[in-house]
Amino acid sequence: MVGTYTGVLIADTATPTWHEGQRELPYIFAASAATAAGGLGMIAAPVAEAGPARRMAAIGAAVDLAAEYRMETSLGIVAETLHEGRAGRLMKASKVLTAAGAVGGIVLGRRSRIAAMASGAALVAGSVCTKFGIFEAGQASAHDPRYTVVPQRQRMERGGSHGAVST
């Protein structure tokens, strides 16, 4: 799946937010892609035939939100970049759109074509916001040296890799 590979590729860089999130990014990118695909299926398919798309969207949304939460709580200081500025706004929008789209798809999407289409559009938009939010957070972390220096010092204090970025 291209989404997973993209997550692996950006995590294998020296960009602090992306590198520190290397365990979660492939899951986030795969789940976000599944969520968007399910959302697109909800938009395109008749309500009676969109059950598999709704299920894929709901599962993708749950995994996406869980992996994002895990990443945000495990990154330490670098997680600041996911909550501030443009990245923070995009990540907040991604959570709201993804959750609303998933709930709307499950609750209303099986009865109303308009609700299914609106929920599907919210899921696709949430996926886009996730990708661009992570991109912006990586850019922000690359421009501020403390997001490189502080994690390196913390690894050294724990007896880690003498400040080198580990993969």
Please describe what each predicted stretch is:
Residues 1-167:
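Short amphipathic, positively biased membrane-proximal segments
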